[in-house]
Every structure is written in structure tokens, then in C-alpha cells.
């Protein structure tokens, strides 16, 4: 096995909401659509390394909970693994509003 990279950081759930406009303070806005995908700095770097065929090990804590379950399933589907498992805590999420 050749040299590789160690990728340390976060794997999070990105919840992307399509909206007509960014809401002003104190106002509401309704989403036209929603999608969910894995994001986070470490995951994004690992995904790019995988596409370029670079050996890497992803150290991104994967917890327990609904966000962690989604992330774990998507990591497996994409061929990524993380040996860091955290009991009693869920992964985070980022709510992204896109005009």
C-alpha cells in the first residue's frame, strides 16, 4: 500500500431548502423543495480524494441518532468508512437555504 492521507473532521447532514428569497428578520418563507446529503469538511475532502484515487482514512465521528443513521447509510453507499463511532450523541446538521 502506498502513502495516503488521514482526513480528520466532521461528517454532517446538509439539509438543502429551495426558497424564493432569503427571509428578512421576523418574516417567514416557505420551501419549494428539500434535499438531504452528507456534507462536512472531512467528508467533502474524503469524497474528493476517493474520486481522484488517493488512499485515505476518514476520521469523522459517527454517532447514534437519526442524522447519524442517515450519514452512516450514505457513507456505506458511497464506499466510505469511518472507524470513529460515538455512542450517546448524534451527528449535526446544517440547514442551507438556496435561492
Regions found by a protein language model. Name each.
Residues 1-61, 66-70, 76-77:
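Glycine-rich phosphate/adenosyl-contacting loop at the front of the ribokinase-like
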Residues 74-90:
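A glycine-rich helix N-cap at a beta->alpha junction
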Amino acid at each position: 500500500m502506498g502513502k495516503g492521507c488521514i482526513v480528520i473532521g466532521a461528517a454532517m447532514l446538509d439539509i438543502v431548502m429551495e426558497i424564493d428569497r432569503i427571509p428578512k428578520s421576523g418574516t417567514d418563507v416557505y420551501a419549494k423543495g428539500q434535499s438531504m446529503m452528507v456534507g462536512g469538511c472531512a467528508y467533502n475532502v474524503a469524497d474528493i480524494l476517493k474520486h481522484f484515487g488517493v488512499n485515505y482514512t476518514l476520521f469523522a465521528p459517527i454517532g447514534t441518532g437519526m442524522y447519524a443513521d442517515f450519514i452512516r447509510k450514505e457513507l456505506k453507499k458511497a464506499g466510505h468508512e469511518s472507524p470513529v463511532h460515538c455512542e450517546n450523541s448524534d451527528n449535526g446538521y446544517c440547514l442551507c437555504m438556496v435561492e
